From Swiss-Prot:
A GO cellular-component term linked to this record: cytosol
Record's compositionally biased regions (Basic and acidic residues): 1-14
UniProt key word Repeat: yes
Subcellular location: Cytoplasm; Nucleus
Tissue specificity comment: Embryo specific, only in dry mature seeds. Expressed at low levels.
Protein name in the entry: Late embryogenesis abundant protein 32
Primary localisation category: cytoplasm
UniProt organism field: Arabidopsis thaliana
Chain's role: LEA proteins are late embryonic proteins abundant in higher plant seed embryos. The function of those proteins is not known.
InterPro entries: LEA_SMP, LEA_SMP_dom
Protein family: Belongs to the LEA type SMP family.
Span(s) of short sequence motif Nuclear localization signal (NLS): 5-9
C-alpha cells in the first residue's frame, strides 16, 4: 500500500495572510531573501532572531512557498528589496521595538526600562506621563504611512472621547478628521492617493479639546474599538491601539 503524498498548497503564503499590512505588499508571496533580510535586521539589534517574531514567521512562510513551488530559494520581493526590512527602537522611557517590511509595520513590542530614582513631586510625576494626545502623535512614527480605515477612525474617536470625558465629537477635531479620511479612502483604490495616519495625527495633542495621561482603561477601550471595526478582528501593529497600549504601560510605572 503506497503512502499518500502530502498535498501542495494551492496558493503561496502572502504578507497579507500573516501580517496586518495593506496595498501591494499584502498580495506578495513571502520570499526567502525577504526572510533573510529580516533575520539580519533582528540579529543586528537583538543579537539573534526573535522566537515567534516577524523573521521567524517570514522564514516559515518562505519555506512553505519554496516547497509549494511558488518561489525559488534565491527569490526576493522587489518592494521589500527597495524599501528594506528594518528594526527600529524608540522612546527614551522604554525600549519600543518596531519591525518594518517594505515600509509597513509587521511587529511591535515594548520593554519598560528599570528606573531607580529619588522620590519626585506630584508635578514632576505628571510631567513624565504620556498623554492621550501624545500617544496619538506617536502613531505617526510607527504607522504614519498607513491609509486611514474605519478601524483607525473608531480607535481615534474612542481616544478623543476618553481625553475629553464626553461622547461629543468636535466637528474640527481629530476624530472627525479621521472619520472623513476613512470615508474618503473607502472610495479610492490606490494607496498612494489615500489619506494616511500621519495626515490626521500630526499635532494631534494640540487639536484635542482636552488631554490627560493614558490609563490602562483608556488603552483597553481603544483596543476594543479598533478590533470591532477591523474585519480581521485584530489591531494594527504599531497603530493607534498599540500606541495607547504602550503609553499606558509606561504610565503605570510612574508613581503619581
Amino acid at each position: 500500500m503506497s503512502q499518500e503524498q502530502p498535498r501542495r498548497p494551492r496558493e503561496p503564503v502572502k504578507y497579507g495572510d500573516v501580517f496586518e499590512v495593506s496595498g501591494e505588499l499584502a498580495d506578495k508571496p513571502i520570499a526567502p531573501e525577504d526572510a533573510k533580510m529580516m533575520q539580519s535586521a533582528e540579529t543586528h539589534v537583538f543579537g539573534h532572531t526573535q522566537k515567534g517574531g516577524p523573521a521567524a514567521v517570514m522564514q516559515s512562510a518562505a519555506t512553505t512557498n519554496i516547497r509549494g513551488g511558488f518561489v525559488h530559494p534565491d527569490d526576493k520581493t522587489e518592494l521589500v528589496a527597495e524599501r528594506g526590512a528594518t528594526v527600529e527602537q524608540t522612546v527614551p522611557a522604554a525600549t519600543v521595538t518596531t519591525e518594518f517590511v517594505g515600509g509597513q509595520v509587521v511587529g511591535q513590542h515594548v520593554e519598560p526600562r528599570r528606573v531607580v530614582a529619588a522620590a519626585r513631586t506630584d508635578e514632576e510625576a505628571l510631567q513624565s506621563t504620556i498623554t492621550i494626545g501624545e500617544a496619538l502623535e506617536a502613531t505617526v512614527k510607527t504607522a504614519g504611512n498607513k491609509p486611514v480605515d474605519q478601524s483607525d477612525a473608531a480607535a481615534i474617536q474612542a481616544a478623543e472621547m476618553r481625553a475629553s470625558g464626553t461622547n461629543v465629537i468636535a466637528l474640527a477635531g481629530v476624530a472627525a478628521s479621521a472619520q472623513s479620511a476613512a470615508d474618503h479612502n473607502a472610495t479610492v483604490d490606490r494607496d498612494e492617493r489615500k489619506i494616511k495616519l500621519r495626515d490626521v495625527l500630526t499635532g494631534a495633542a494640540g487639536k484635542l479639546s482636552a488631554d490627560r495621561a493614558v490609563t490602562r482603561e483608556d488603552a483597553e477601550g481603544v483596543v476594543s474599538a479598533e478590533m470591532r471595526n477591523n474585519p480581521k478582528l485584530c489591531t494594527h501593529p504599531g497603530g493607534v491601539a498599540a500606541s495607547l497600549t504602550v503609553a499606558a504601560r509606561l504610565n503605570e510605572r510612574v508613581d503619581i
